[in-house]
Amino acid sequence: MIDFWKSAIRQQFHAAIDMLANAIKACPDSVWSAQGQGAFWYLAFHVLFFLDLYLSSEDESRFRPPPPFGLTELEPEGVMPEPAYGKDELLGYLEHCRKKLDAVMSAMTEAWIADPCPFSYRAMSNGELLLYNMRHVQHHAAQLNLRLRQTTDSGTALGVKGRSERQGLTLMRA
């Protein structure tokens, strides 16, 4: 039964990541480079940073994102990273997170699912954190798509299954 759930969660998580990737790719430069906390590039970075963090097996005190990304998202003052990240940098970070998700899903066990997550401020199991993380990605992917629709009268489609399904990983029947 766990193989069924691993596959289903992986596919839906990849679909959420695909929506984020599609929004990043579809964003015109004029929208991408807007300034402030609500900047398109910043929201994309924010969701990728926490996707990466919450897929980690250690808490934020030991977490290090891949270069050139820093830990500004953990600053209580809400410090913006400088300079603004480009699409290629964030799409590279997205691929890093995609691989990390696949590693987490491949190693998932029933015991791991039930274990407490490593973040003291999130009183939940690893399994619940995984679902929370997927909802966070989906929330911001939808937010970015709404921004595209409002500013460019375009957006991206809602995928039914993620890229892993198209790469030959199928739902397994228990």
PLM feature spans:
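Hydrophobic alpha-helical core bundles mediating ligand binding, dimerization, or RNAP-core interactions
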Residues: 13, 17, 24, 94, ...
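Acidic/histidine-rich alpha-helical segments that form the ligand environment
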Residues: 77-117, 127-140
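Short, contiguous alpha-helical
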Residues: 10-14, 18-21, 29-76, 116-174
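Sec/Tat-exported extracytoplasmic proteins
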Residues: 24-27, 105
